[in-house]
Curated annotation (Swiss-Prot):
GO molecular function, one term: ion channel regulator activity
Subcellular location field: Secreted
PTM-bearing positions, type 6'-bromotryptophan: 37-38
Species: Californiconus californicus (California cone)
Protein name: Mu-conotoxin-like Cal 12.1.2g
Disulfide-linked positions: 3-16, 11-28, 18-33, 27-39
Notes on the domains: The cysteine framework is XII (C-C-C-C-CC-C-C).
UniProt main location, coarse: secreted
Keywords per UniProt: Bromination, Disulfide bond, Hydroxylation, Ion channel impairing toxin, Neurotoxin, Secreted, Toxin
Length: 45
């Protein structure tokens, strides 16, 4: 899998959800960690 972003040194993949405290405030949808609104939970390797 290709990593979209790293949090705590862990890969975040397409379709993941990022926390508000994630670097750059990233959240994600199925296109990757790029959406501008917050989503619940996280999905790491």
């Amino acid at each position: 899998d290709v990593c979209d972003s790293l949090v705590g040194g862990r890969c975040i993949h397409n379709g993941c959800y990022c926390e508000r405290s994630a670097p750059n405030g990233n959240c994600c949808d199925t296109a990757g960690c790029t959406v501008l609104w917050w989503c619940p939970g996280t999905k790491f390797d």
